[in-house]
From Swiss-Prot:
It comes from the Bacteria. One of its GO terms (molecular function) is aspartate carbamoyltransferase activity. PROSITE patterns: CARBAMOYLTRANSFERASE. This is Aspartate carbamoyltransferase catalytic subunit. GO terms for cellular component: cytosol. Pathway: Pyrimidine metabolism; UMP biosynthesis via de novo pathway; (S)-dihydroorotate from bicarbonate: step 2/3. It holds the Pfam family OTCace. Belongs to the aspartate/ornithine carbamoyltransferase superfamily. ATCase family. It catalyses: carbamoyl phosphate + L-aspartate = N-carbamoyl-L-aspartate + phosphate + H(+). Carbamoyl phosphate binds at residues 49-50, 99, 126, 129, 252-253. Catalyzes the condensation of carbamoyl phosphate and aspartate to form carbamoyl aspartate and inorganic phosphate, the committed step in the de novo pyrimidine nucleotide biosynthesis pathway. PANTHER family: ASPARTATE CARBAMOYLTRANSFERASE (PTHR45753:SF6), ORNITHINE CARBAMOYLTRANSFERASE, MITOCHONDRIAL (PTHR45753).
């Protein structure tokens, strides 16, 4: 794997391999590389979980983390992202994890020697989040085939929804969508069925909630926090209708008492904290796959 830019670029075999490697890392597997590797985390949007779990993953792998602060970089002087990455490549950085507000920011960067991991591109995709979600689901159910998965909330503005709906359908899951119609893109119907939340909760094995992305709205939102929770959120009453073995997921950050009732965030059915934990192991698997391929290509070049 040279880069990780989108879920669509991964084959089912590659996905299964990454999930298997993540499981091994969770059981204590150690990675070894023939040469010292360097990574840089370039975040142009706020992040807590993605940024910190990539850094923890890098350090667990023995990868040196190169500091980067967008606000104090030469990009504030007009340097392009391409030239910034060219610099990182020139000084010996192996992989760049990038979070950016622009969708498809990585177009035109793929042919650089430095590997690129998409840490989220606007409303586009979030492949490492999607992979950790898959890892969490597989840990619970052992398969994706035939699972009923709900994606509920601010779907139109969610890169997580965009990644997950495509890959879950490929893996054999049945998808359901819910949330405000004005925040729903009809193109999603190619992947699943839209249902009112009260009808959906009784059907699904996985209830995947999405954050209301206030920063991507025009500022004229139609709902107060209280009205959103009442109409579309996972309330205590709705959660009581979930199947006995159903799980609750959320990519975080969570708006408590908006998408989900406060007391449900750390409840028995919730896998929200587990998702955060699993993020480290799946990101270790991603980085290992990229760095091992770099080692293999370097070895071939010596012959």
């Amino acid at each position: 794997m040279k880069n990780l830019l989108s879920m669509e670029a991964l084959t089912v075999h590659e996905i299964e391999h990454l999930l298997g490697q993540a499981a091994q890392f969770k059981r204590g597997k150690k990675a070894t590389f023939t040469e010292q590797a360097f990574a840089v985390n370039m975040f142009f949007e706020p992040s807590t979980r993605t940024h910190t779990s990539f850094e923890v993953a890098e350090k667990k792998l023995g990868v040196e983390v190169v500091s980067f602060d967008a606000a104090s970089s030469s990009m504030t002087k007009g340097e392009t992202l391409y030239d910034t990455l060219l610099t990182m490549q020139a000084v010996g950085v192996n992989v760049a994890v990038i979070r950016h507000s622009e969708e498809n920011y990585y177009e035109g960067l793929e042919n650089l020697d430095i590997a690129i991991v998409n840490g989220g591109d606007g409303c586009g995709e979030h492949p490492s989040q999607s992979l950790l979600d898959l890892f969490t689901i597989k840990e619970q159910f052992g398969t994706f085939q035939g699972l009923k998965v709900a994606i509920a909330g601010d779907i139109r503005h969610s890169r997580v929804a965009n990644s997950n709906m495509k890959v879950l359908k490929r893996l054999g899951a049945e998808l359901f969508f819910s949330g405000p119609r004005e925040w729903f893109d009809e193109s999603c119907l190619a992947y699943g069925t839209y249902l009112p939340v009260d009808e959906m909760v009784e059907k699904v094995d996985v209830m995947m909630l999405l954050r209301v992305q206030h920063e991507r709205h025009s500022g004229t939102e139609a709902f107060t926090k209280e009205s959103y929770h009442e109409k579309f959120g996972l309330t205590i009453e709705r959660a009581a209708k979930l199947k006995a073995d159903a799980i609750i997921m959320h990519p975080s950050p969570v708006n408590r008492d908006v998408e989900i009732a406060d007391s449900l965030v750390e409840s028995e059915k919730s896998r929200i904290v587990t998702q955060m934990t699993n993020g480290v192991f799946i990101r270790m698997a991603i980085l290992e796959a990229i760095l091992k391929e770099q080692e293999m290509r370097a070895k071939l070049c010596t012959y």
